[in-house]
Amino acid sequence: MYNVGKIVNTHGLIGEIRVIATTDFPEERFQVGNTVYLFEKNSKKPEKLIIRSHRKHKNFDLLMFEGLTGIHQVERMKEGVLKIKETQQTDLEENEFYFHEIIGCTVVTTDGEELGEIIEILTPGANDVWVVKGADKKEKLIPYIADVVKEINTNDKKITIEVMEGLLD
């Protein structure tokens, strides 16, 4: 299962929850009628939930679920995580990848030098930035742009980059 949101609080008295989306597709993931799975804090057993309503409010997604109509029924969800099954993922365009496909990949240069493993993806704006942790425990920031990233092989968990001047300084 894959994370699509973290519940940070309740909202109002009618059973809405406040979610920070961890998906690039919140409008699609949180569409009315869709199923998500709640993993409450300190629980390994998921609860299947069907989305009854979705709206944006500031930087949050506000959700309500079928059968849950009051704050007293959703307070327990605080700090929980919403997930979807792998079969619920949508197909991506060419050269688009899910974060979970990229995180854990080994990054090597076109000269064959291994730089480390991608441990995180930042989304600051125009393009994603991959955080690569090397054997020396230092983190390097690699922009996901065509001039740098030359090949992505998610099956082998290997990414080849061309090191531009100043990139690793």
UniProtKB/Swiss-Prot annotation:
Q: According to its UniProt record, which protein family does this protein belong to?
A: Belongs to the RimM family.
Q: What is this protein called?
A: Ribosome maturation factor RimM
Q: What Gene Ontology cellular-component terms does the record carry?
A: cytoplasm; ribosome
- Which HAMAP family does the entry link to? Ribosome_mat_RimM
Q: Where is the signal peptide?
A: none
Q: How does it assemble?
A: Binds ribosomal protein uS19.
Q: Give the GO biological process terms.
A: ribosomal small subunit biogenesis; rRNA processing
Q: Quote one Gene Ontology molecular function term.
A: ribosome binding
Q: Which Pfam families match?
A: PRC, RimM
Q: Does the keyword Cell wall biogenesis/degradation apply?
A: no
Q: Where is this protein localized, as stated in its record? A: Cytoplasm
Show where the PRC barrel domain sits: 94-167
Query: Briefly, what is this protein's role?
Result: An accessory protein needed during the final step in the assembly of 30S ribosomal subunit, possibly for assembly of the head region. Essential for efficient processing of 16S rRNA. May be needed both before and after RbfA during the maturation of 16S rRNA. It has affinity for free ribosomal 30S subunits but not for 70S ribosomes.
InterPro entries linked: PRC-brl_dom, PRC_barrel-like_sf, RimM, RimM_N, RimM_N_sf, Transl_B-barrel_sf
Q: Which Gene3D superfamilies match?
A: PRC-barrel domain, RimM
Entry remark concerning the domains of this protein: The PRC barrel domain binds ribosomal protein uS19.
Q: Which UniProt keywords apply?
A: Chaperone, Cytoplasm, Ribosome biogenesis, rRNA processing
Q: Give the matching SUPFAM superfamilies.
A: PRC-barrel domain, Translation proteins
Q: Does the keyword Thylakoid apply?
A: no
Q: What is its main location?
A: cytoplasm
